[in-house]
Regions:
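Structural recognition of the beta-strand scaffold that forms the well-ordered cores
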Residues: 57-60, 85, 239-244, 264-270, ...
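Basic/polar, cationic surfaces and motifs that engage anionic cell-wall
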Residues: 1, 5, 163-220, 308-369
């Protein structure tokens, strides 16, 4: 049985409960050493120096995207690669941009740790130039806020702001992560983000105005693009399908809002604090499980199937509360006959939620445990 672990003092950051985590409940202790021995630390230091990007910022962006896990060069849901999540899809081309900026081949940018980090730093610097940051500006972590928001690739300013806030919360709380067996540390530090135009952008979790729950009361309504789901249903709702995003929370929301993605889910759950974004009304058919779409509700969980650090207790509990509500609302059995993994839906070739998802603990929570 999985023991409950309380996550204290971390909001809107990619916290976790194993060794490859932000230090929940407080910042990373001690001073970070940009010259620490090891290929990952050396790569971050070298890339930061080459492109005049703060080393801690590069680490925080990478951690927010992937927990510094390149996943062996395998693509994310929106076809992003490596610890810096360099993307190649119809709407975003940071992988190709990194290749142009660094002269590195795409294959190396996808699979080689140092090359990928160098590519991410190059893209950040190019965005800084676009935003008019001069040499003095680039020395101030706070000045990079609009650049980080742009790195998200989000078309919704609220999602871009959430992405940047996550990175700056990581800088404030500190990071201690494991990259291929090597500790990478960012000491917690006070940073005042210079938000620029994002200062007037309403936060995604601001429930005033039209940001409200559509179905589940404890969720934020931020709809997917209408090209990515079908209005109405051809079958009654009988099943909850558990997914893992293979990407970040902000990235997944942005991907579902991209009309080229042709994919969506009803709900997305954040790793750090269990925040839930509702993207397709329950009465409509999200495109998440092929043959299972007509009769199911899809819940995406931020993270990657091969990295258990994303599956926090806050995520489990928040998702389980949502599933309990869905089961009570639609008469779905609160067991493994009514709550299934994406891999268990007929006609699917996906593997999520994967071997690290604790089904016993989750079903216990759904049933009030």
């Amino acid at each position: 049985m999985r023991k409950a672990v309380k996550i204290n003092g971390v909001a809107a950051v990619a916290g976790a409960v194993v060794a490859t985590v932000v230090l929940a409940g407080g910042p990373a202790t001690g001073q970070q050493d940009a010259t620490a021995a090891g290929p990952a630390n050396e790569a971050f230091a070298a890339a930061a120096a080459e492109f005049d990007v703060p080393r801690d910022l590069v680490v925080a962006v990478g951690y927010g995207e992937t927990h510094l896990d390149g996943h062996g060069g395998k693509p994310s849901q929106d076809n992003g690669f490596g610890v810096m999540h360099l993307v190649s899809n119809p709407k975003r081309h940071t992988l190709e941009q990194a290749a142009d900026l660094t002269g590195a081949p795409a294959h190396a940018l996808k699979t080689d740790l140092a090359t990928n980090i160098r590519g991410g730093a190059a893209v950040l610097r190019a965005l800084a130039d676009e935003h008019g940051l001069d040499a003095a500006d680039r020395t101030r972590l706070g000045a990079w806020y609009p650049v980080v928001a742009a790195y998200s690739g989000a078309t919704d300013d609220r999602v871009a702001k959430m992405y940047a806030d996550t990175v700056y919360d990581l800088l404030g709380n500190g990071v201690r992560a494991n990259a291929r067996g090597e500790d990478v540390v960012v000491a917690g530090q006070f940073v005042r983000p210079e938000q620029g135009r994002f200062a007037s952008v309403r936060a995604l979790d601001d429930v005033s105005g039209d940001v409200h729950a559509m179905d589940y009361p404890n969720s934020i309504w931020n709809p997917a693009h209408s090209a990515n789901y079908s209005v109405g249903r051809s079958s009654a709702i009988t099943t909850v399908v558990i997914h893992v995003t293979q990407g970040s929370y902000a990235g997944t929301i942005s991907w579902f809002q991209n009309p080229d993605s042709q994919v969506s889910a009803h709900y997305v759950v954040r790793s750090a604090d269990g925040e839930i974004t509702h993207m397709v009304a329950d009465a409509d058919t999200a495109w998440h499980a092929r043959s299972g779409n007509p009769y199911s509700i899809g819940i995406e969980h931020e993270g990657f199937v091969d990295d258990p650090s994303w599956f926090t207790d806050a995520m489990y509990r928040s998702s389980a509360a949502l599933t309990t509500w869905l089961c009570d609302t639609y008469g779905i059995p609160k067991d493994r006959s009514g709550i299934v993994g994406h891999n268990e839906v007929p006609g699917n070739d996906h593997t999520d939620p994967g071997p690290h998802w604790d089904w016993d603990y989750y079903i216990q929570l759904v049933n009030g445990g």
